[in-house]
């Protein structure tokens, strides 16, 4: 968790907007000196402009706020409630929280979400990994290893948000992803050479394949430091402990790089987002295949577990949007959705561990060799 505090300015300095009250902070985005009231106004107005420019909402929309109890989602709930009343958006706002099953972290943060429910007078729905997948993140990490935690959690959490929204009859979920998160994602995809994801890194509205539920980011252009300052000055109730498994995430590498760049050039966060928005990748070259390759049938049709725990299903024809996963029945553009692929890998690995531990010495080596291809 990055600790952020307002930089002290001279007592004699006046707010650069109202020129009447003393400035209490410098905006990290442009170093503008502002008083509290002007900061609130600028902060909220910029988010309103983002919402209007991107046409995120329509009157009467029922919107689920992805609530974790952290600073981003807490400020998002507070600001959306304020803007909804000020500009008469006509939205019906609901808090949607995901319980991943991380002891000592999520149980405490959910207590904060429940307080937010009362403070903001919004309905709250909690969806748990245990109920949806029969796994908790603690169990997944014990089986797949801590380095894979974010891979699993990202896929499962996105589907859990979709499922929670569908349960509530909602087709729009807003999340607290901020400008820092967007810039980090661009850097991560550049560092990994992930051109497929790089093209979509800065989309303000996203949607899972086959799902009618869209996810949007009203904080796309809002600096994390300003979100923390807003929460601090408004005295909002939020949970500040970092996820237990976050230190192992590759995102941390991009975050440290971004901090170094920001110390040299404060505008680099917006610059990176701008670059991501306007990046045009060269068109992919079409592969020329011979009739032999085209007609060649794949003889090995068994499911294979990949390094990240997902299951490869061979070269099957992809489903169209609107079809459903053959395993869980949820909307998917493939025969088996990503969540079920990951869970299948976990079940296979757990079966291997169980056999290794319980099989008698005679025959154990044969069974182990047979199932070895299923391990991560």
UniProtKB/Swiss-Prot annotation:
Protein location: Cytoplasm
Key words, A-Z: Cytoplasm, RNA-binding, Transferase, tRNA processing, tRNA-binding
Gene Ontology annotations of biological process type: protein urmylation; tRNA thio-modification; tRNA wobble position uridine thiolation; tRNA wobble uridine modification
Main subcellular location of this protein, as a coarse class: cytoplasm
EC number(s) recorded for this UniProt protein: 2.7.7.-
This protein's pathway: tRNA modification; 5-methoxycarbonylmethyl-2-thiouridine-tRNA biosynthesis
Sample GO molecular function, one term: tRNA binding
PROSITE patterns: UPF0021 (PS01263)
A Gene Ontology cellular-component term: cytosol
Family: Belongs to the TtcA family. CTU1/NCS6/ATPBD3 subfamily.
Function as written in the Swiss-Prot or TrEMBL entry: Plays a central role in 2-thiolation of mcm(5)S(2)U at tRNA wobble positions of tRNA(Lys), tRNA(Glu) and tRNA(Gln). Directly binds tRNAs and probably acts by catalyzing adenylation of tRNAs, an intermediate required for 2-thiolation. It is unclear whether it acts as a sulfurtransferase that transfers sulfur from thiocarboxylated URM1 onto the uridine of tRNAs at wobble position. Prior mcm(5) tRNA modification by the elongator complex is required for 2-thiolation. May also be involved in protein urmylation.
PANTHER family assigned: ATPASES OF THE PP SUPERFAMILY-RELATED, CYTOPLASMIC TRNA 2-THIOLATION PROTEIN 1
HAMAP family per the UniProt record, alphabetical: CTU1 (MF_03053)
Protein name per UniProt: Cytoplasmic tRNA 2-thiolation protein 1
Organism listed in the record: Scheffersomyces stipitis (strain ATCC 58785 / CBS 6054 / NBRC 10063 / NRRL Y-11545) (Yeast)
